[in-house]
């Protein structure tokens, strides 16, 4: 289990399970063919200062694609969440914020 305190929370929308699923999906992207080199292309985009636009663009892309390409594809929603997490990462670095 991801969170020790989750046993104390009565999740109404399966957030605990969905977060575990999302983490497994994100972990799988690090084993994908495009991450076999030392650096991912996304890192170069971030380093060039285009990280937020790249992430928000992909959030919009996969949100718009949901239900159109390959039907109502769960993976499209996972990609929306993954890019949103990366956007949060960029935000925290740029604004020097974190939890």
Stretches found by the model and what they are:
Residues 1-99:
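Intrinsically disordered, low-complexity regulatory regions
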């Amino acid at each position: 289990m991801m969170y020790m305190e989750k046993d104390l929370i009565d999740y109404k929308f399966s957030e605990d399970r969905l977060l575990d699923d999302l983490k497994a999906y994100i972990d799988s992207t690090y084993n994908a063919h495009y991450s076999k080199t030392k650096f991912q292309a996304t890192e170069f985009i971030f380093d060039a200062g285009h990280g937020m636009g790249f992430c928000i663009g992909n959030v919009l892309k996969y949100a718009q694609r949901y239900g159109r390409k390959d039907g109502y594809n769960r993976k499209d929603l996972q990609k929306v969440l993954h890019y949103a997490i990366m956007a949060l990462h960029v935000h925290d670095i740029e604004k020097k914020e974190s939890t």
